[in-house]
């Protein structure tokens, strides 16, 4: 069990962006902190209104974006576009190569101007195979989250094939999310590798103690642990059944 506090994260901060990295990213490199299981990136990004990431390339990566506040506009070279907001998950398969941009929407869904930043978590996992076709999918799951349990957001695992979830091209990984009311609990799946990130609030985990916003725990070969919210909380959990290099 490896607990990583919010203050331990690497950070990129410029005029329009505050990005906190759970793993090595960009100019920040730590050879002892490159991934956990199949997860290479878990970035906690805050982007100011009217700003964002201009068109840039990706290749051979499954990228899942989860918005916590505000709205984010996506456009890519495959002709896909969409506005992502809390409760709507997005997956982009980079495959043989894709160009895309991500920007703070600068508009509320009502069409009114606003001055709010957008905060989102972007997560990258490796695909089963390189050189697949680029792809895009988004899915509204806000209703499922209201139930308070662990919801499968994205998965390539055969057992989730019949569930309402975004598909990813990685048969050994699944992303789950939960919005947990204070005092309530969820049970984590048992897996060789788990990564739990506290996106909001605070939780306690069996054998790990309390985690607060921005904290994470990396679990290896643990059973099904119980997570209890000490305040209203939102968590993101990667379940992985192998690691990079097998």
Regions found by a protein language model. Give the residues of each.
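Jelly-roll (double-stranded beta-helix
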Residues: 1-246
């Amino acid at each position: 069990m490896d607990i990583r506090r919010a203050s331990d994260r690497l950070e990129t901060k410029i005029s329009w962006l505050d990005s906190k990295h759970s793993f090595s990213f960009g100019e920040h490199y730590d050879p002892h902190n490159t991934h956990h299981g199949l997860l290479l990136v878990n970035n906690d990004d805050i982007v100011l209104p009217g700003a964002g990431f201009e068109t840039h390339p990706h290749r051979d990566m499954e990228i899942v974006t989860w918005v916590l506040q505000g709205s984010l506009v996506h456009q890519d070279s495959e002709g896909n576009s969409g506005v992502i907001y809390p409760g709507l998950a997005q997956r982009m398969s980079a495959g043989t190569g894709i160009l895309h941009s991500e920007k703070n929407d600068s508009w509320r869904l009502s069409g009114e101007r606003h001055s709010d930043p957008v905060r989102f978590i972007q997560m990258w996992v490796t695909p089963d195979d390189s050189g697949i076709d680029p792809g895009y999918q988004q899915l509204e799951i806000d209703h499922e989250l209201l139930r308070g349990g662990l919801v499968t957001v994205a998965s390539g695992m055969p057992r989730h094939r019949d569930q309402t979830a975004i598909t990813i091209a990685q048969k050994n990984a699944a992303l789950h999310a939960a919005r947990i009311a204070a005092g309530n609990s969820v049970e984590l799946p048992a897996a060789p590798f788990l990564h739990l990130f506290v996106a909001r609030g605070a939780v306690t985990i069996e054998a790990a103690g309390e985690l607060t916003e921005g904290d994470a725990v990396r679990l290896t070969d643990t059973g099904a642990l119980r997570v209890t919210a000490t305040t209203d909380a939102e968590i993101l959990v990667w379940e992985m059944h192998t690691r990079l290099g097998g």
